[in-house]
């Protein structure tokens, strides 16, 4: 885009309103679905059908405040403190193993005053920032030397071990794909991944085979109907919910499966209730919203690259990969395409930690967009000044 067009667009649209618009619709849909899917379980557990909705609204408010603060922080701050941010994440992962709250056999949450904080959500944003800084600093080496890529094995290996000890296989997988995607965008050759992914994949397969818990998840995912009232119960109920929606859904608030038939209907399996109430058309619209987020994040990243703002561009790419990958996995789990991962549907599922970190991630992307627009305007002013002289 010519500089003059860029300047005019930056003056008219000081921030990416397509991204803000898609996010606003997702938030609205998310609150609607948390309200609908949690009515029965809220009434049963707390005697208040709005309990989970009110907590989600509080988390959204907290996330918006955090996003506003992050939007005001220059990206140079994150570039300077990327290492400290990652170390804080590792320390929190150790603390959660010692002091964490165990839910459904996993120690993933640190009990705090306002919420149970899921540290793996913090690690996702910490990894994006750390990778952006590393790749910005070692861009040439990453493209030419396998050593520059394998150097990441130590910090991320420690992180992966701590995550798997919780255990949190889903977040480990998401973070691994984020790292891979950012490396590819930075120009790392494919052969580097063949040399690293194959041994890691072999190790993961061995972990699944030797763990009855993980093996049961894989078996249930492959054929949930073989045990519809036992290990396959949750997935079969999710599939029933999705199937009931047909083309146009049964209507907002009219889901049957949310009436204590489908466990975790307001968290990891909220998508199935959404599909039941909104149907295939609603699912297509939801997918379009996530693709819009991905496109806008990648567009912001590309424009940052065009201004040689590689750190900010990589953050935008990393956050885009994170949001859409997690959405795809969650939808796939609900539709029986992937084993259960324990991942939320971004901006939709109930969960304070996820909402908070996602808002911070999007705020960083908006900050990238803001600084890129400012750089374009400054460049155009310099050019006009030189022309007058």
Swiss-Prot record:
Enzyme class: transferase
The organism of origin for this protein: Hydrogenovibrio crunogenus (strain DSM 25203 / XCL-2) (Thiomicrospira crunogena)
GO CC term (a single one): plasma membrane
TM helices/strands, residue ranges: 15-35, 58-78, 85-105, 112-132, 145-165, 169-189, 192-212, 269-289, 311-331, 345-365
EC number: 2.4.99.28
Pathway membership, UniProt: Cell wall biogenesis; peptidoglycan biosynthesis
Subcellular location: Cell inner membrane
Superkingdom, natural source: Bacteria
Keyword terms, alphabetized: Cell cycle, Cell division, Cell inner membrane, Cell membrane, Cell shape, Cell wall biogenesis/degradation, Glycosyltransferase, Membrane, Peptidoglycan synthesis, Transferase, Transmembrane, Transmembrane helix
Membrane topology, Cytoplasmic segments: 1-14, 79-84, 133-144, 190-191, 290-310, 366-389
Location, primary (coarse class): membrane
The family this protein is said to belong to: Belongs to the SEDS family. FtsW subfamily.
Entry-linked InterPro entries: Cell_cycle_FtsW-rel_CS, FtsW, FtsW/RodA
Periplasmic face of the membrane: 36-57, 106-111, 166-168, 213-268, 332-344
Name of the protein in its database record: Probable peptidoglycan glycosyltransferase FtsW
Function noted in UniProt: Peptidoglycan polymerase that is essential for cell division.
Molecular-function GO term, any one: peptidoglycan glycosyltransferase activity
């Amino acid at each position: 885009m010519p500089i003059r067009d860029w300047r005019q667009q930056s003056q008219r649209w000081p921030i990416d309103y397509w991204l803000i618009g898609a996010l606003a619709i997702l938030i609205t849909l998310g609150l609607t679905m948390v309200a609908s899917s949690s009515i029965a379980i809220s009434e049963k557990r707390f005697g208040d059908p709005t309990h989970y909705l009110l907590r989600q609204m509080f988390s959204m408010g907290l996330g918006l405040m955090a996003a506003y603060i992050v939007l005001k922080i220059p990206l140079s701050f994150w570039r300077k403190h990327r290492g400290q941010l990652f170390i804080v994440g590792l320390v929190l992962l150790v603390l959660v193993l010692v002091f964490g709250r165990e839910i459904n056999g996993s120690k993933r949450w640190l009990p705090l005053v306002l919420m149970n904080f899921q540290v793996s959500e913090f690690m996702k944003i910490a990894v994006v920032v750390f990778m952006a800084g590393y790749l910005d600093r070692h861009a040439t080496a990453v493209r030419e030397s396998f050593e520059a890529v394998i150097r990441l094995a130590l910090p991320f290996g420690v992180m992966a071990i701590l995550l798997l000890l919780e255990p949190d296989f889903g977040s480990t997988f998401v973070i691994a794909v984020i790292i891979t995607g950012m490396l590819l965008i930075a120009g790392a050759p494919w052969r580097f991944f063949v040399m690293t992914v194959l041994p890691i994949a072999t190790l993961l397969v061995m972990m699944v085979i030797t763990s009855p818990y993980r093996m049961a998840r894989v078996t249930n995912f492959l054929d949930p109907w073989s045990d519809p009232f036992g290990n396959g119960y949750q997935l079969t109920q999710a599939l029933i919910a999705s199937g009931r929606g047909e083309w146009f859904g049964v209507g907002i608030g009219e889901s049957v499966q949310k009436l204590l038939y489908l466990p975790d209907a307001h968290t990891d399996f909220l998508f199935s209730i959404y599909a039941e109430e909104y149907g295939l058309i609603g699912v297509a619209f939801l997918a379009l919203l996530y693709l819009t987020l991905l496109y806008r994040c990648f567009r912001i990243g590309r424009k940052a690259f065009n201004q040689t703002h590689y750190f900010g561009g990589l953050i935008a790419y990393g956050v885009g990969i994170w949001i859409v990958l997690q959405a795809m996995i969650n939808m796939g789990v609900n539709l029986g395409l992937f084993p259960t991962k324990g991942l939320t549907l971004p901006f939709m599922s109930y969960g304070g930690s996820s909402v908070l970190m996602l808002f911070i991630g999007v705020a960083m992307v908006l900050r990238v967009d803001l600084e890129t627009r400012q750089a374009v305007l400054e460049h155009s002013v310099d050019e006009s000044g030189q022309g007058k002289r």
